[in-house]
Amino acid sequence: VVKDVCAAALLALLVAPRPAAADADALWYIVSEQCVPDQEQFHSPKPCELVDFGAGYVVLKDRVGDTQFLVMPTARVSGIESPEILAQDAPNYWDDAWRARRFVEERVHHPLARDDISLAINSLDGRTQNQLHIHVDCVRPDVQAALRDNASAIGPTWAPFPIKLSGHDYMAMRLAQPEFTHVNPFVLLADGIPGARGDMAHYTLVVVGVPDGFVLLAGRATGATNRGSGEELQDHTCALVDKFRQTSPVKSAEFRRKAPNGREPSVRFYPLAH
């Protein structure tokens, strides 16, 4: 179970001490006390990969896996249950997360197809951190295959996905557009599934790219055997990159990381965030 595994090793203390080491505000501490002030004072986002003040989000490399990144607001937003994410003028963190797939590509040294990438947010029951964070990583190969094999069953409105994914039931819908610029998946969930708007805390939401847009998957926490952790559909080992092992890594500047200029601040914590 994703939550149980992660709770056991939430933080790794590297340099400076912090009170209440294994607490649910660890991610917010990293955002508000490290990434944001270091970007403001020293023009370096570390320990984050990116701080975007204009759009109001950061990108942080998670300790789990080689290719997993987290997209988080610079504002205090607890999670999928937060009413502000459904506001008409709410920042579209899914659009930011989709753009952040480039960090995954940089880690595998190769461009990835749309259907190799997934985004996921866990339910209140299925997470350990109380700062909204969208997981960006490769999709599990078996989930990718299931979506391809059952593509004809996924339409423009929410409907039960024909088979279980990772042993759990999901609702699915297809979004036929390449970006999230004009649509908020949180709102599609809240307004598209009866009763979801008043019960968002118990929902998990996953987005998987497809050639002509996206597939959205929504699951609901139902108890100890299903905590609503859509992150279970992601592969933090990114086994999909095995198909590139017979090809040469991309060497272009697009996939080379540049070292940040200025001061490199001490890194205190890296979370196992879920």
What role is predicted for each listed range?
Residues 1-2:
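N-terminal secretory signal peptides that target proteins for export/translocation
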Residues 5-16:
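Bacterial N-terminal signal peptides
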Residues 21-274:
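HIT superfamily nucleotide-processing domains
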